[in-house]
Swiss-Prot record:
EC number(s) from the headed UniProt entry: 4.2.1.108
Gene assigned in the entry: ectC
Highest taxon of the lineage: Bacteria
Example of a GO MF term: ectoine synthase activity
Family label: Belongs to the ectoine synthase family.
CDD domains documented for this protein: cupin_EctC
UniProt entry keywords in alphabetical sequence: Lyase
Any GO BP annotation: ectoine biosynthetic process
InterPro entries: Ectoine_synth, RmlC-like_jellyroll, RmlC_Cupin_sf
Organismal lineage: Bacteria, Pseudomonadati, Pseudomonadota, Betaproteobacteria, Burkholderiales
UniProt protein name: L-ectoine synthase
Pathway: Amine and polyamine biosynthesis; ectoine biosynthesis; L-ectoine from L-aspartate 4-semialdehyde: step 3/3
Transmembrane regions: none
Swiss-Prot/TrEMBL catalytic activity: (2S)-4-acetamido-2-aminobutanoate = L-ectoine + H2O
Function noted in UniProt: Catalyzes the circularization of gamma-N-acetyl-alpha,gamma-diaminobutyric acid (ADABA) to ectoine (1,4,5,6-tetrahydro-2-methyl-4-pyrimidine carboxylic acid), which is an excellent osmoprotectant.
Length: 131
């Protein structure tokens, strides 16, 4: 059994920070669950281009506000507590922070190793862990 507190990830290499978000990666590929599990905060007033070509992601919004805009059709969806969205078709999108920090719980398949950051195209590369 794996039991962790997200507080134990803070300040470690499993807490990844960019200009627009901070992600605490609680379960990773090395844990052998077949998915990774993260608590992420999107900073207010930010806009992040994302296009997960190699991963599927489900996101549960638990606090704050923001929006997601799909690039293919320009649709915008408001995000807030209780909203779930799934990028089941590797949907390219803009993730926008609102007036308050947007706190979300994310599940990725295949699982992340922990150190991924978006490249210039908004993609997480498939990363193999060192043996």
């Amino acid at each position: 059994m794996i039991v962790r507190n997200v507080k134990d990830v803070m300040g470690t290499e499993d807490e990844v920070r960019t200009d627009t978000w901070v992600s605490r990666r609680v379960l990773l590929k090395k844990d052998g669950m077949g998915f990774s599990f993260h608590e992420t905060t999107i900073f207010p007033g930010t806009r992040t281009h994302i296009h997960y070509k190699n991963h599927l992601e489900a996101v549960w919004c638990i606090e704050g506000d923001g929006s997601i805009e799909t690039i293919a059709d320009g649709k915008t969806y408001e995000l807030g507590p209780g909203v779930v969205y799934a990028l089941n078709e590797n949907d390219e999108h803009w993730l926008c922070g609102g007036k308050q920090p947007l706190r979300v719980i994310c599940v990725f398949n295949p699982p992340l190793t922990g150190q991924e950051v978006h490249d210039a195209e908004g993609v997480y590369a498939l990363v193999e862990e060192a043996a």
